[in-house]
Amino acid sequence: MENKLRSAAAIAAQTGLEADQLKDWLETPPDPAMGDYAFPCFRLAKSMRKAPPAIAAELAGSIGHIDGIASMEAKGGYLNFFADKTAFVRDTLNKVLAQGDSYGDSDLGGGRNVCVEYSSINIAKPFHIGHLPSTAIGNSLYRIYKALGYNAIGINHLGDWGTQFGKMIVAYKKWGDKPVPQCTVRELVKLYVRFHEEAEAHPEMNDEARAWFKKIENGDKEAVTLWQQFKDLTLKEVGKVYDRLGVRFDSYAGESFYEDKMGAVIDELREKGLLTVDKGATLVDLSAYDMPPCIILRSDGATLYATRDLAAAIYRKKTYDFVKSLYVVAYQQNLHFKQFFKVLELMGNDWVKDCEHVNFGMVSMEEGTLSTRHGNVVYLEDVLDAAVEKTGKIIEEKSPDLPDKDEVAAAVGVGAVVWSMLYNSRIKDVTFSWKKVLNFDGETGPYAQYTHARCCSVLRKAGVYDVNAMDASCFSDDATASLAKAIAAFPAAVLAAAEKNEPYIVSRATMEVCTAFNKFYFCNQIITEDAGVSAARLALTDAARITIKKGLYLVGLQAPERM
């Protein structure tokens, strides 16, 4: 980054333009033979009234020495900058070693609050593979914002209200055969599926379910007790899965939490003349914005998701005074969030500009979609178990003497599943396939974790090294420079991931370091008889280890030291 700034400043001195603007115009050539940075001179063609090749040649002749830059070359319409490899590698690793585990962090956030809503499971429903994208993306963003100096607030907006709980009570009272605390969520799901099967032939069961939910709303002791038991059981079970994933939340305030907060929102909407009634339903007309109406109350007076989301957004702003409020929810809810944000705006809440729907593609099974009603679900717990079991077998085959095999298998197996969700742009749909998720070759989580373990192994074998004794003259080869370049690019990737709310940018940057390190490892003997060369290459290995470990952490993976 320093070389980029210095190069931009040198161009600014010759053109009179702002260095910050010029810095943004500098590109990274696709071929390293074309330089480390390239300035596209067509950007200046109009103002300078010259052809880009002429501008490039003129700048190359007029710019003098730049610290950290070995040479410049005018090539076509580009001015290419070639970094001093030795100085660049030395400066990069010194920076990483000085910052240690905080490499990639910044104080950008200044302690300001960022709300991140993710996972948002439904009570007494399966925690299935379809919940993984929201959980993994949200957890990664939570960690990324923390690393950038924000006070991230993780929110699990529980689906813990609605007529489905009336259905659950009816099913439990008809077919349940033991106290709720002794049940499993899977048993409750079977009851729920059975309710829907039976209700198709006996629709009056739906009336019975509505009556039981009304009892919950009215505070009936038996109904509320059952509802709370369903909730406690679910949170206890999913808590174990969250622990395996390394996921945490600061708030579990869900739909039920906002029941007593919606009245004030509805009153405000009415006072501001935003409500109209159509066919018995109370709504906000959004036809002027090319959107369907946002329904606030159904004809029977029941609230909807939008009503609760409005109450939740206003509560979060008052409680946390956030600078950003992120909703990590599937793209199928795009319209809902457009409507909901527009209503917030019409209410006069200018802070709605700080709210963002962080959408993502859907997860489907190779053989079909996921549905709780018909029991066609793949539990996330089963996916993690299968991944850990397969990893354990691989370890047993390749490293039977590895200490703490079970812990390593758990870290790598779970990591493989999480990484598969975070290695591509979040908007892409994912077809869940055992073969893909449990493939341990290529650009996978296990490959990144193995590279970290390889770094640790080299450093263990070497013992203590003296960074002050390093001989920087060995930093001139391409493999070494490529590794330093990948490491140096990492902090910018963390910033970009937050700017775009795209964790995959960190995953890709981490993989770049892994790939570059393995090339460096095979091209260079790290521990040699020359103490200065050994110290230099060990220092670079340590810098790679630090960067990979941080990258793995930011996307929710552990970094085993032995594999």
Regions found by a protein language model. Give the residues of each.
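Non-catalytic interaction-recognition regions
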Residues: 1-90, 98-563
